[in-house]
Amino acid sequence: MKITVIGAGNVGATTAFRIADKKLARELVLLDVVEGIPQGKGLDMYETGPVGLFDTKITGSNDYADTADSDIVIITAGLPRKPGMTREDLLMKNAGIVKEVTDNIMKHSKNPIIIVVSNPLDIMTHVAWVRSGLPKERVIGMAGVLDAARFRSFIAMELGVSMQDINACVLGGHGDAMVPVVKYTTVAGIPISDLLPAETIDKLVERTRNGGAEIVEHLKQGSAFYSPGSSVVEMVESIVLDRKRVLPCAVGLEGQYGIDKTFVGVPVKLGRNGVEQIYEINLDQADLDLLQKSAKIVDENCKMLESTIG
């Protein structure tokens, strides 16, 4: 199994290291446009092998030729939003980056599974799908896995229980448009509504929506990377080991939930072939309305990018 991570920043490097540490790849490529960064980080990771007991071949590179014949490619490359930059500016710049990255990936790998982490997530996943020409089941956005992990973490803090006993369902877009579905959120099988008052649940939902911003506020510079990197690796593990995990991911819908031709976060089965099944679960009307609203925002932004992405 050969896995490539595009972007050697905090998210990309964390993702690459966890893939190596969990022995999910025989060969791992960390690629970045900045000379020396992927080479240095790649070598540092490789030198942990004797301690971590893994033999993954790790290559740091600036050349897409080194990514040839990758089975999985993870795109973390992109710019953060800077002061004075409008959302439209960020969209255009990152769409250009993801377009170029995807074009280069496809020159060297015929049929990879592409996992997109770059923001705005759902829209960048659409860009990667359009440019790659791959079937929708092979282009996946990492969104709900991270959002659900944050929701679970906050519930565990509130109740003082193990995170392992908490299951959470978060659908929709990554960010303000996410839809944490309370009725499918449980603690050891017990509905969260039986354990916490509605106003406390509402506060946890709101904290989940602002989870990324909360970390940015603490850090002052930069954003989250341990939790996004770990969330990507949960997806990679299900694909590589063909575990058939049911995880919330941004995928291209074709009529499910009344949404068509739009990438949005819903529960899917992830296996060796990528998205092997999309689950259309029963939603309350309020949650369905929020999900469709989230999809509409994604669709509008994608239409704005049509001339950019070709």
Curated annotation (Swiss-Prot):
SUPFAM superfamilies: LDH C-terminal domain-like, NAD(P)-binding Rossmann-fold domains. The active site is at H174 (proton acceptor). GO terms for biological process: lactate metabolic process; tricarboxylic acid cycle. Pfam families: Ldh_1_C, Ldh_1_N. NAD(+) binds at G7, A8, G9, N10, V11, G12, D32, N94, V117, S118, N119. Keywords: NAD, Oxidoreductase, Tricarboxylic acid cycle. Catalyzes the reversible oxidation of malate to oxaloacetate. This is Malate dehydrogenase. It comes from Prosthecochloris vibrioformis (Chlorobium vibrioforme).
